[in-house]
Amino acid sequence: MVAFRMMSMALLVVVASSWWASPVEAASSPRVDHRLVRRSLFDPSCTGVFDRELLGRLNRVCDDCYNVFREPKVATECRSHCFLNPAFIQCLEYIIPEVLHEEYQANVQLVGK
């Protein structure tokens, strides 16, 4: 029982020390570029308003469409040209209720200017 507690404490110390790394160590870690990586997930052809929430909603349509059809080209074609393509329109018609289509198409125009 004592050995188990000692092992648990040692594991806790290792996890805590890696979690609270010093700023010097954090600067050299790959997590520093996290914002750049997240931003680069979106199509660089989207030259309009950069709104994470809006782009996330549009990406979600493509993700859901991919989950339905399970074809890799669906995901890539849906996002191409900043969502301004026939694949996105087809996914929109299949995934989103018709009353919201105009809202989503307006969002595409907003991010893709």
Swiss-Prot record:
One of its GO terms (biological process) is glucose metabolic process. Residues 1-26 form the signal peptide. It is found in: Secreted. InterPro entries: Crust_neurhormone_CS, Crust_neurohorm, Crust_neurohorm_sf, Hyperglycemic, Hyperglycemic1. Keywords: Amidation, Carbohydrate metabolism, Cleavage on pair of basic residues, Disulfide bond, Glucose metabolism, Hormone, Neuropeptide, Secreted, Signal. It comes from the Eukaryota. GO terms for cellular component: extracellular region. Disulfide bonds join C46-C82, C62-C78, C65-C91. Gene3D superfamilies: Crustacean CHH/MIH/GIH neurohormone (1.10.2010.10). This is Crustacean hyperglycemic hormones B.
